[in-house]
Amino acid sequence: MDNYTRAYVLGKLRFKAPKEIDYDELKTGINNLNATQNFSRISYSLEPKDNGNELKINLSENENKTFLKFGLHYDGLYKSAILVNVTHKKSMFKNDVLSMDLALGDNIRYNLDYYIDNGFYWSFGIKSRFNEFNRNVKTDFNDGTLFEQTGLNSLNMDFSDLTNQIYVQTVFIQKYLIGAGLEHKYLRIETENLEENSRVFENSTYISAFGYLKYDSFDNRYFPKNGWLFSGDIQSFLYSSDYTKEFDRFSIAKGEIGFAKNFAKKWTLKIQSEAGFSFGNESVDFFDFVLGGYGNQTINNFKHFLGYDFLIISGDSFIK
C-alpha cells in the first residue's frame, strides 16, 4: 500500500495476526474497513494451510483525497444554518484525516478535527470547536439564586464556547477504546436582562485533563437490534482565570450504558441509561448538567431530554 500502513488496516479490521477468527469477526472487520471509504475495492481469499486457512486481503486504494459536502440544518437552539464540510486525507502523514465543519446562519459554529489513526498503536488527535447561541432559558446556572434575587423566571442569554483539545487513544484488547488528553476552554455567558455591571455571568478560561473508555457492539448506530454500549469519562478542571472568583479544582464523571436484543422479526428491546455527577471541591455552576431539547451533538454537559424545552433542567448530577 502506498498511502496506508499495516497498523492502520489491522486497527480497522479489529484483529491481529496470527489469530483464529470466525466469520462474524471477518464480516465486521471488512465492513469497518469499507466504511472508511479509503479503498475502492476490497477482496479476500482463504488459502489452506497445515493448521487451518490463511486469510489474504487485497486492497485497492481510493485516489480521492478531498471531499466537499453541503447541507441545511434547523433546531430550536441554534436555529437555521447552511452546513459546509471539507474533509482532506493524508495532509501530512499516511493515516491522517483533517475535517472542518462550518455552520453559517443565525449562530455561527465550527468544528475542526485532525486525527492520525495508527490502529492498535497509540493514535493522536487535535480538536477545536466554537459554539454560540442566544436563547431565553429557565436556568441561571446558580441554583436559582439569581431568579430569587431579581424576581425573574427566565433570562435572555448569549452563550459562547471555544474549546480546544489534544488527545491520544488506542484500542485495548481489540475491543475497548481508551484515551486521554488535555483541554483548553474559553466560556462567556452574558445577558441583557440585568444592570450593566451584572450582565456578564462568566468570562473565564479553563484548563482540564480528561480520560475515557468506550465499548460499542451495537449492530446499527441509530436502530440497533443487538449489542452492548458502554461509555465513561472523567474530566478534572485544574486551572481557571476565575472571572467569578469562585473556582476550586473539581472533577466531573459521566457514563452511558445501553443494551439491545432482537426477540422476533420486528421486535427489539433496547434499554439505555446515562448519568453524571461532580466530585471534589464544589463544582462551577456553569458546568452543571443541563437537560432539555433534542439533536445529535451536545456540548459541555448539555443533555437532550425529549419532552422538555432546551436548557430547562439543571443540577450538579443527573440520571436518566
Which residue ranges define each predicted feature?
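C-terminal outer-membrane beta-barrel translocator/porin domains of Gram-negative envelope proteins
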Residues: 70-72, 206-214, 218-320
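Hydrophobic transmembrane signal anchors and adjacent membrane-proximal interface regions, especially
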Residues: 15, 53-55, 202, 248, ...
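Gram-negative/organellar outer-membrane beta-barrel architecture
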Residues: 19-25, 29-218, 222, 297-307, ...
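Extracytoplasmic/secreted envelope proteins and their assembly/folding machinery
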Residues: 6, 10, 26-30, 254
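Short beta-strands and strand-coil junctions in structured, solvent-facing domains, enriched
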Residues: 4, 16-20, 40-41, 120-121, ...
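Acidic, glycine-rich low-complexity/disordered segments
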Residues: 1-22, 175-176
